Amino acid sequence: HPAYAARAAAQSTVTLQLPARRGNFYDAQGRLLTGLEERWQVVCFPGQGNYDRLYACTDAAGQALLYRSRSRAAPFLLEVSCDPARLGLTGYPAARRYAAVPLCQHLLGYLDSTGHGAAGLEKALDAVLSGTGENSSLVCAVTAQGTLRTGETARLLQADSGALGVQLTISRPVQRAV
């Protein structure tokens, strides 16, 4: 029966939302003020056996997520700081918004927990920087145990949020020195 087949297919498909792309701030020479640290999102599948390798490549929040999700029956996304290709994994770029030592944070401001501007230029220019807020997503055909079905790969569904960057008249080297 086609309706049962469609329902079964829907139950065995997991869609994971990648972080929405947000425009960056640039200095007067076009150098990045935000998005300086390269990061990746990696899809983790139950029983994949890469938890040990990923543990060293993520921060404390990621390590806690790995620990909580070790017996999970569905795939999940994990942010890592090392290139996933070196680990034999597929990663999706997702730069860390602010450097460990933020640049001109009094001017740029910061984001709230939903990824929208909460203060400074991040708030004032939120509509430009976030665009439509659309996310790209990964669609995974999984088994009942949450592992990727044999012969399948995660499909990336690209979405363009239309987010734009903003160039400021300040200088990154001067801001680093301050």
What is the predicted role of each segment?
Residues 155-177:
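A conserved hydrophobic secondary-structure block that centers on an alpha-helix together
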Residues 41-51:
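A short, polar/charged loop-to-alpha-helix boundary motif
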Residues 34-39, 56, 61-163:
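Small/polar-residue-rich segments within soluble enzyme cores
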Residues 1-15:
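Aromatic-capped interface at the extracytoplasmic side
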